[in-house]
């Protein structure tokens, strides 16, 4: 029996090889296979956002002005969510709602679903871009893995949360003031600040900022003076074999400050990766819980005692009253189509309100 070893010869003009060669060619801006997803989706998402904030009103969906054309500025303009009556419709331009009419599509809030979906796929494309480039230059894929944190937060807040509610209407609109309003909504209707997943998210993000500041300052403090350049950036050769700063000195310094310190660069930098990414993922999990209307911590005993004893009040009971006030005001303001009217006797009252 004869065994032939070797590769099966391919056709000279193989389409896949031709595309692979062009897409992954070394150029100023790398394209890659991931670019087929990233660049079109990012272009449409940003283009839709700029179009919406410049020209498109929210009068038909929220009863608001939301564009530069109507007098808004960068902080108050937004691409707002579709009307509550449209539920979870994808609002395709050629769908039954707009029927190919671009103006009507914009009035109904079609730009929001357009920006949200293209934005989500653009973020996924950017993550794949990091995987692809890491594989090309033989790096580990931790950059891409880290970027899963922001993707998880975006998908949970803009897509999963409104899918768990009655419609896209309850997602955040794409604008600065609109996001602030959404944060107030989360607090009033879900008591988000007392949610343990939010607490873990805050600990992760602020802890990462602290770690970043400490790490940057420590490296600057322990740089070796082995260059004669005028500043840090010109004093070192990017191909030098020696380390740029003294890990031993840094370890000794923080050992004296705290009693403990990182003694290993790998563990130090993995910890700096782990803290923010875990925080973002915990926040995303918490928002998925809110989509299902899971509650935060409830200290019912304090609420009962506060109701029975006018002299007893805690920061928790004050916040619960404040949340009731947010709901009573925001529900009527935010959902005018419901024609909500709250009589005086149901509005929250407290010792300090």
From Swiss-Prot:
Chlorophyll a ChlzD2 binds at residue 118. Keywords: Acetylation, Chlorophyll, Chloroplast, Chromophore, Electron transport, Iron, Magnesium, Membrane, Metal-binding, Oxidoreductase, Phosphoprotein, Photosynthesis, Photosystem II, Plastid, Thylakoid, Transmembrane, Transmembrane helix, Transport. It catalyses: 2 a plastoquinone + 4 hnu + 2 H2O = 2 a plastoquinol + O2. Chlorophyll a PD2 binds at residue 198. Its main location: plastid. The keyword Thylakoid applies. The modification N-acetylthreonine is found at residue 2. SUPFAM superfamilies: Bacterial photosystem II reaction centre, L and M subunits (SSF81483). PROSITE patterns: REACTION_CENTER. One of its GO terms (molecular function) is electron transporter, transferring electrons within the cyclic electron transport pathway of photosynthesis activity. Its EC number is 1.10.3.9. It is a multi-pass membrane protein. One of its GO terms (biological process) is photosynthetic electron transport in photosystem II. 2 of the reaction center chlorophylls (ChlD1 and ChlD2) are entirely coordinated by water. Belongs to the reaction center PufL/M/PsbA/D family. PSII is composed of 1 copy each of membrane proteins PsbA, PsbB, PsbC, PsbD, PsbE, PsbF, PsbH, PsbI, PsbJ, PsbK, PsbL, PsbM, PsbT, PsbX, PsbY, PsbZ, Psb30/Ycf12, at least 3 peripheral proteins of the oxygen-evolving complex and a large number of cofactors. It forms dimeric complexes. This is Photosystem II D2 protein. It comes from Agrostis stolonifera. The gene is psbD.
């Amino acid at each position: 029996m004869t065994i032939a070893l070797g590769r099966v010869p391919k056709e000279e003009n193989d389409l896949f090889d031709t595309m692979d060669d062009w897409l992954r060619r070394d150029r100023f801006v790398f394209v890659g296979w991931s670019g087929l997803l990233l660049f079109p989706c990012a272009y449409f998402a940003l283009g839709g956002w700029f179009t919406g904030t410049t020209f498109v009103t929210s009068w038909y969906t929220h009863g608001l002005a939301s564009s530069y054309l109507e007098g808004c500025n960068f902080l108050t303009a937004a691409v707002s969510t579709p009307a509550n009556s449209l539920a979870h419709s994808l609002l395709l331009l050629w769908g039954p709602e707009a029927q190919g009419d671009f103006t009507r599509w914009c009035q109904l809030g079609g730009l929001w679903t357009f920006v949200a979906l293209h934005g989500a796929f653009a973020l996924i494309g950017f993550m794949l871009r990091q995987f692809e480039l890491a594989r090309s230059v033989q790096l580990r894929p931790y950059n891409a893995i880290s970027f899963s944190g922001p993707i998880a937060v975006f998908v949970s807040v803009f897509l999963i949360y409104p899918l768990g509610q009655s419609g896209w209407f309850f997602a955040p609109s794409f604008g600065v003031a609109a996001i602030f309003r959404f944060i107030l909504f989360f607090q009033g209707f879900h008591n988000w600040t007392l949610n343990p997943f939010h607490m873990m998210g805050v600990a992760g993000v602020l802890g990462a900022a602290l770690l970043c500041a400490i790490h940057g300052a420590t490296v600057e403090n322990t740089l070796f003076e082995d260059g004669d350049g005028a500043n840090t950036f010109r004093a070192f050769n990017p191909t030098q074999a020696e380390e740029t700063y003294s890990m031993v000195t840094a370890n000794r310094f923080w050992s004296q400050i705290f009693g403990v310190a990182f003694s290993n660069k790998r563990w130090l930098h993995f910890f700096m990766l782990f803290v923010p990414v875990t925080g973002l993922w915990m926040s995303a999990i918490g928002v998925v819980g809110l989509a299902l209307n899971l509650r935060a911590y409830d200290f019912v005993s304090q609420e009962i005692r506060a109701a029975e004893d006018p002299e007893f009040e805690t920061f928790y009971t004050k916040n619960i009253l404040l949340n009731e006030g947010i709901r009573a005001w925001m529900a009527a303001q935010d959902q005018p189509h419901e024609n909500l009217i709250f009589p005086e006797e149901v509005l929250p009252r407290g010792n300090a309100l």
